[in-house]
Amino acid sequence: YQRFIAAPLQEEAANEMFVAQQNFQKATDGVASDSLYKLSLNGSEGKFGFLKIADEYSGTDAGNLANYYAGIAYLNTGKYTEAIDYLNKFKSDDIVLGALAKGAIGDAYSQKNQPKEALENYLKAAESNKNDFTTPRFLLKAGKTALTLGNKSDALKYFTDIKENYEATPEAASVDVLIGLAQ
């Protein structure tokens, strides 16, 4: 099965995804981003977009990764419900990418003015794997969201965690002011 079905499907999915990834990267770089995100979602140049890849190749790594890309593209084009749906379908053992996906779900909920759900996902992102890149980033978002919810004690806990355990990160540079707000 692996050799005759799964491996060829994976290769085919990766080939289909190349143009969509190029469009996504150009959109991320800020070049006519909305239309490029749409091309990355729906396809162009005779190649599938992330939506079709996620559907047609759902059992492959490329199909799974297409869920992530589709979610981020939807997030960046203001379609937050769709972003949440696709990001929730994405599964990853990659410590950074998995956390970024959970954090992006938090961002989508934040944009939908659902701060409790945003906070829940920021905490999942921060705790999914402790590291100097994603953990302080999402602890900071969790703290700001907790402040928005009026939960100063939790916000203080998140900000203090950044100050004490991630002092060399960019997030630590602004955390003293936020600690003052949370006290």
Residue spans for each PLM region:
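Short solvent-exposed coil/turn linkers within tandem alpha-helical repeat scaffolds
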Residues: 7, 55-63, 77, 91-99, ...
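Extracytoplasmic/periplasmic/luminal assembly and interaction segments
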Residues: 30-82
